[in-house]
UniProtKB/Swiss-Prot annotation:
GO MF terms, alphabetically ordered: 4 iron, 4 sulfur cluster binding; iron ion binding
Function of the molecule: Involved in iron-sulfur cluster biogenesis. Binds a 4Fe-4S cluster, can transfer this cluster to apoproteins, and thereby intervenes in the maturation of Fe/S proteins. Could also act as a scaffold/chaperone for damaged Fe/S proteins.
InterPro entries per the UniProt record, alphabetical: Fe/S_biogenesis_protein_NfuA (IPR017726), FSCA_dom_sf (IPR034904), HesB-like_dom_sf (IPR035903), NIF_FeS_clus_asmbl_NifU_C (IPR001075)
The family this protein is said to belong to: Belongs to the NfuA family.
Keywords: 4Fe-4S, Iron, Iron-sulfur, Metal-binding
Organism: Xylella fastidiosa (strain 9a5c)
Biological process annotations from GO: iron-sulfur cluster assembly; protein maturation
Cofactor(s) annotated in UniProt: [4Fe-4S] cluster
Cofactor note: Binds 1 [4Fe-4S] cluster per subunit. The cluster is presumably bound at the interface of two monomers.
Name this protein carries in UniProt: Fe/S biogenesis protein NfuA
Disulfide bond sites: none
Highest rank taxon of the organism: Bacteria
Length: 199
């Protein structure tokens, strides 16, 4: 169930009335759900823009439409319109399930490594256009990775591996003893920092 405060309803109603489109409502959806970069998106929704499988929440003078694929991720979400200490007003959306749930310690070593790579490491690498994929996790706890995007061929990949990826995996995943790079960096087409420049 999604909770919407009366203040948020009044705020939405003011915005909808300003648009002056008959039947306009507000659509709520989850963007990149289940990942560290997950976010909630609110936008105006005219009747002609609706897909037809949205969940409807009657807010009195307008309808909040929830994208059907987002319902599970937005369950227990709270929407409020609050006044900050500075006097400014802000719309707040709290969606506790949108980023998914961290794997428990009973998850396998491979599952825990993959979860940390996908939800903590890759969002950081994405700022440089990079990414990393788990190729293998040995029974002894050695993780073999393959870098891609801006990390493929990057002159700073050794620093990224040791001070970023390996450090994070060893701190966050009990059982990881080492991290190795399986990437052929000589074939990188668009490195973030050229290996020649970094030398």
């Amino acid at each position: 169930m999604i909770q919407i405060s009366d203040r948020a309803k009044a705020h939405f109603l003011r915005l909808i009335q300003r648009e002056g489109v008959p039947g306009m409502g507000v659509r709520l959806s989850a963007v990149d759900p289940g990942t560290a970069r997950a976010d909630a998106r609110l936008e105006f929704a005219e009747p002609s823009e609706l897909v037809g499988d949205e969940w409807l929440i009657d807010c009195g003078d307008f309808t909040l439409y929830v994208a059907s694929a987002s319902v599970a991720w937005l369950d227990s979400a709270e929407i409020d319109y609050v006044t900050q200490a500075t006097g400014s007003q802000q719309l707040i959306i709290k969606a506790p399930k949108i980023k998914g749930q961290e794997l428990s310690q009973v998850a396998s070593l491979v599952e825990r490594v993959c979860w940390v790579v996908e939800n903590e490491i890759n969002p950081q690498l994405a700022s440089h256009g990079g990414r990393v994929e788990v190729q293998e996790v040995s029974a002894e706890g050695v993780v073999l990775l393959r870098f891609g995007g801006g990390c493929h061929g990057c002159g700073m990949v050794d620093v990224t591996l040791k001070q970023g990826v390996e450090k994070t995996l060893m701190e966050r995943v009990h059982g990881v003893i080492a991290v190795r790079d399986a990437t052929d960096h000589s074939t990188g087409a668009a490195p973030y920092i050229s290996r020649n420049f970094a030398s």
